[in-house]
Amino acid sequence: MVLTTDTKFSEIYDIIKGDSVQGESVLILVARDCDSIAACKILTEILKSDLIAYNIKAVSGYEDLENVNSTLLENEEIKSIIMINCGGNIDITNVFTNLNDQQVAYIIDSHRPYSINNITNESSVLIIDDGTYIEQDELQQLSDDSEEEEEELEEEEAEEDVVEDEAEEAEEAEEAEEAEEAEFDPENEDNPENDEDDGGSENIDENERKSKKKNKKDKKSKRKHRKKKKKKSEKLEKTYYGKSAAVSMYSLSTFLNKQNLDDLLWYAVLGLTDQFIHEKITLDSYEQQYKNFKELILNNYPTDGDDDQEERYRPGNDEDDYDENGDLKRHPSSMFLHGDKIIPSDDFRFMLYRHWNLYESLFNSRYVACKLRVWKAKGRFQLESLFAMMGIPLDQVKQKYNSMNVHYKKQLKQLLAINGPKFGLVNLYFNSFLKKYSNNSEISASDTVYAVTALMESDNLESDQSDQDIWEQNFWEAYDSISNKNIDLLKIGLKQSIQLQKEITRQVTSMIEKRSVILSGPFRYAFITESSDLKYFIHPLALTKLGLFMMDAFISMGKAKRPFLIGALNENKNSYLIVGISGSHSTDIQSNTFGEYFRKSAEYTDATFKYQSFDTSIVEVSKTDLHKFVEHLHGTMQTTQISK
């Protein structure tokens, strides 16, 4: 069933708390992304506040859930299984066959749509919804309204058909009149045989006209029925995301009056930022949620009567905001606040610049790189020209940002606002947040997400551990990194993220220069097979970043907007990791249809195939089956496109 009210959640939490008296009764299953980790952090803080024992198990896909079913669920002490971003879109009772009558799976998942079996299950599965299921009901009403409009359009089309039919009848009447005139031709008047033949011919023609008219109407009716059926089918096939699990979990904490526990608000901000960075939600959805969090943050961190805290903390907004090293200073009005605080702030759309240098940050950031087309000499010249017009020497922008002359750092935002539009860089900022630590150091929400994600998808090639052991170790490092006590771990993640982004840009340049991208009718695709490149891209989120970059690169070159299929060979498994991307923020498309096409192609070709995450648009296909899999995918999507 679906749970949507705070009252019911309070009741459910009381049940979880009551069961905890028996021992370690809560098992938390967590997917491998920053949003899931942030949501888990919120949940564990809540559980710890009530002295509820718990066990955390990281899961990367369906196989891990099956392993949980065959091992952990046999523990009779476990009463509650809380699933974060790892159960909403699959039938839980099919996977957790060992659930006993005393166990309940609680799902907090941003993946949409929900499995219908989870919704209808009345005993062992409960979805803690963010409100989007209600919205889906409302959307169903809108859909019904839309169908009414469609019926009205069909009626209009029918009226047009009537007009066409009347025109045809008029034409036929005219022909009949001409024939009648011919019958009364004086030359034919004396021929009785003509009268007989004409009369018989007239009856046959009339029957043919009626038959043709009926066939025509039947064809139109079938065509309209097929179109309507297809539209309904497409609505069910698309996957998309609801609110981040961390945002949902924070909302639930407010229902329990536990929202003031340490760092819960920051974890929620990270969950929202993760969805934005990885383009799982629309810009409009992000902006609306940003406003909500901004209000919460301003209420939690008052500024001594200053109603516009956000303006006071926009980077570069005021020279007095900087110290002698060019770093943002703590505002005097906040000195009475102890510990860390969150600050609403504009963030640049060139990534990690605080921990990098300006030149490489702009060069490797997708937005700037695609606008300037830095894979070409002209694009690189434009980037250098931008700095020249801003009056910042290259030796300044190519050194660590922290070492830059404070004067240039102070003027950066203003100079970009003036000169950026000359190069098509008109949207260089987005609304975000900074976390200011008690020691006066700071990190942005976006940089934190980049770092946590990089830690989770890093490789230890020198280790003798199995892939499973390595990624579980990575998960715990990522989990620990967002704690205030592990700033050093975050710094490692920042370095790894910078290295990954450089490799992504290099790979994009290489693919464009080598013409490695193939246009396959309804989509473009490319596969990475060179050993030196593979270690970076055998991870879902890293490969997704590359695919989004490639998609925007082609759009920037004036190519038609098309979905993108990106794959990387995993030599150890002799298989390809494949990510299907339907759209990005630049295409205004956030839903994804690849999941259903992948499933159909795998079934039809009998390919060795498995899901590599809980996102159905990320799969693993055997190397030997790749060609027939992609070939069928092309045929299926081509047929769908033609039939639209």
Swiss-Prot record:
Pfam families linked: CDC45
GO cellular component, one term: DNA replication preinitiation complex
Signal peptide: none
Recorded GO MF terms: chromatin binding; DNA replication origin binding; single-stranded DNA binding
Keyword Membrane annotated: no
Disulfide bonds: none
Biased composition annotated in UniProt, kind: Basic residues: 210-233
Record region (Disordered): 141-235, 301-328
Compositional bias (Acidic residues): 144-205
Biological process (GO), any one: mitotic DNA replication preinitiation complex assembly
Cellular compartments annotated: Nucleus
Keywords noted in UniProt: Cell cycle, DNA replication, Nucleus
Role, per record: Required for initiation of chromosomal DNA replication.
Similarity remark: Belongs to the CDC45 family.
Protein's name in the database: Cell division control protein 45 homolog
Gene: cdc45
